[in-house]
Design a protein with these regions (language model features):
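A short beta-loop-alpha structural element at the N-terminal edge
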Residues: 14-30
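Terminal substrate-recognition subdomain of acyl/acetyltransferases
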Residues: 1-11
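Conserved GNAT acetyl-CoA-binding A-motif
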Residues: 107, 114-123
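Conserved acetyl-CoA pyrophosphate-binding loop and the N-cap/start of the following alpha-helix
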Residues: 97, 101-109
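Active-site rim helix/loop that mediates acceptor-substrate recognition in acyltransferases
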Residues: 33-36, 40-78
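Conserved acetyl-CoA binding element of GNAT-fold acetyltransferases
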Residues: 84-96
């Protein structure tokens, strides 16, 4: 079992984490909205708002994470970066893919990226 995904040779493949910068803003918006489809209070995003969010909160898409399995985006987590500190933001996993380690994989990746950036604090 790797990241909650059975990779024992029965046809299942391993979850992979990619940089968010590999995706278009539209792909990220779609993934973001799908991860929140079951929220009691809707928080829909569009391309303009996501671009503003990335700019206003110093999100580094080249250090942010997108989890995939068999070509499908399962979740994403963005990494905000300011001098000496980083924080995970906009973490979300598809409702039907939760509780299998995807969120943990995204958080571990954010922590690893923050350390690579020399962050003293990771929030």
């Amino acid at each position: 079992m790797i990241d909650g995904i059975d990779s024992s040779g029965d046809g299942a493949t391993e979850l992979t984490v990619h940089r968010a910068s590999e995706f278009t803003i539209e792909e990220l918006v779609n993934a973001y909205n799908q991860t929140r489809i079951d929220y009691i209070v809707p928080m829909p995003m569009n391309a303009r708002r996501l671009n503003e969010y990335v700019r206003n909160y110093d999100v580094r898409l080249d250090y942010s994470a997108v989890a995939m399995l068999d070509g499908q985006i399962l979740g994403l987590s963005m990494l905000g970066v300011r001098p000496g500190r980083c924080w995970s933001t906009r973490l979300g996993v598809l409702p039907v893919k939760r509780r299998h380690g995807t969120g943990e994989s995204l958080m571990r990746d954010n922590i690893r990226m923050a350390r690579a950036l020399g962050a003293e604090y990771v929030i």
